[in-house]
């Protein structure tokens, strides 16, 4: 499973049950990274990908149902039992600080940065894409 998350400067993900932000340039970069493969996510996340609905696999239990090598866009806390199936983590960083109730953390130190690059966002001056693997 290839997990994709969006984080603020404090690794925040959600505030009051809602995503902190979104950016169309980020969505375009993610869809380019995924290629022809489906992008799995829940119904809440799918609303921001309406223009690419034919490329999505929408399932509110997607983390339990997605298999090996599958791309998963995650906007909620990752259940601990999912981590053994995670092969890579792509982090998009907003370079802003937002209020957050849910934060992201790797479960251990087995993850190393494989790639990092900045690109201009649509509503964010700069977004950093980081790819981690075990």
Give the role of each language-model region.
Residues 1-134:
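Enzymes that bind and transform nitrogen-containing heteroaromatic metabolites
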